[in-house]
C-alpha cells in the first residue's frame, strides 16, 4: 500500500514559564506552533495519525496522533 508523506502544522499546549504569574501576564501566552513530518497512515473527522517509519510488513514505529482541533494545515510532500 502507498502512503503519503505529509507536513502537519499544529498548535501544542505549552507551559512557557514556571512559577507564579499575574492573570494579565498569563493571558498573554499562546499555544506553541509546531511542525511534524511523517507517513499519513490514518485520518478521520476526529484525528490524524502519522508514522515515522513503516516496515515492509506494514508495521509502524514512531506514531504521532493529532486531534483535528490542534491541526492548522496538512501538506503533502512530493518525493521520488
Name what the model sees in each region.
Residues 2-80:
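Conserved RNA-binding domains used in RNP assembly and mRNA/RNA metabolism
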Amino acid at each position: 500500500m502507498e502512503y503519503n508523506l505529509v507536513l502537519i502544522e499544529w498548535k501544542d499546549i505549552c507551559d512557557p514559564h514556571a512559577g507564579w504569574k499575574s492573570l494579565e501576564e498569563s493571558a498573554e501566552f499562546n499555544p506553541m506552533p509546531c511542525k511534524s513530518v511523517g507517513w499519513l497512515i490514518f485520518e478521520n473527522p476526529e484525528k490524524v495519525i502519522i508514522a515515522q517509519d513503516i516496515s515492509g510488513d506494514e508495521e509502524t514505529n514512531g506514531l504521532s496522533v493529532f486531534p483535528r482541533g490542534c491541526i492548522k494545515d496538512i501538506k503533502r510532500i512530493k518525493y521520488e
